[in-house]
Amino acid sequence: MDTLTASREKLAEKSKISVKNLDFFYGKFHALKSINLEIPEKKVTAFIGPSGCGKSTLLRIFNRMYELYPEQRAEGDVTFDGENLLTSKKDVALIRSKVGMVFQKPTPFPMSIYDNIAFGVKLFESLNASDMDERVEWALRKAALWGEVKDKLNQSGSSLSGGQQQRLCIARGIAIKPEVLLLDEPCSALDPISTAKVEELIAELKNDYTVVIVTHNMQQAARCSDYTAYMYLGDLVEFGATEDLFFKPKRKETEDYITGRFG
């Protein structure tokens, strides 16, 4: 499929992550095919498309999560702050401190709410007790959770509701002060009220972070994102401003997917 239309979409904003000629393989399976994409800084970019199209695969390349699994490899350029992440000699943990990730299912650590936030910070910074207290409160406030948990910080993170757990995971992700936050279907396991709270939070987070979200929910992409990429069978079909892609798509494949004639 020709992806030149998608890859040449011009952005007015500064690019935070630049993807050029990216291919990805699960063993011999060619999962992503010559992806070209610019992720704008301090905006929300959504990846949409049917199951198996490569959305989550692309997301996990941005912090080299794929390296945790055998026989997976990426080829091409994924430039972040002027450096190709795929060939960087930096400690992967250092890369992930700059590119945080929140998964589909809430994954609080088996420890207190406080320690869930402090755990990652301790890996990269040596803060005294007072400064750590301030960082924990700051992260929980950023995740719109402080008011709900400030009196029970010593309770287990798993004691929270599903929506609260997901916001705890977001707080944990931003506590180390990354530059990019990756969200892999963060609302798929949540009820509508919790989903609304997370969507409000996403709108707030883009003031400080570059946010990339994978979602099966096209309405969510339309509500939350500034830019949207439509993917199909490992190809980037179309990329552009969310309003344009949803209301004036350039590709028939995109229009068919959005209007429900496909997928």
Curated annotation (Swiss-Prot):
Residues the entry annotates as binding ATP: 49-56
Pfam families, A to Z: ABC_tran
CDD domains hit by this protein: ABC_PstB_phosphate_transporter
Domain ABC transporter, chain residue ranges per copy: 17-258
Reaction catalyzed: phosphate(out) + ATP + H2O = ADP + 2 phosphate(in) + H(+)
Superkingdom of origin organism: Bacteria
UniProt-listed SMART domains: AAA
GO biological process: phosphate ion transmembrane transport
Subcellular localization, as worded in the UniProt entry: Cell inner membrane
EC number: 7.3.2.1
Protein keywords: ATP-binding, Cell inner membrane, Cell membrane, Membrane, Nucleotide-binding, Phosphate transport, Translocase, Transport
Main subcellular location: membrane
Listed GO MF terms: ATP binding; ATP hydrolysis activity; ATPase-coupled phosphate ion transmembrane transporter activity
Assigned GO CC terms: plasma membrane
The protein's assembly and partners: The complex is composed of two ATP-binding proteins (PstB), two transmembrane proteins (PstC and PstA) and a solute-binding protein (PstS).
Functional summary from the UniProt entry: Part of the ABC transporter complex PstSACB involved in phosphate import. Responsible for energy coupling to the transport system.
Alphabetized PANTHER family for the sequence: ABC TRANSPORTER I FAMILY MEMBER 17, PHOSPHATE IMPORT ATP-BINDING PROTEIN PSTB
Protein name: Phosphate import ATP-binding protein PstB
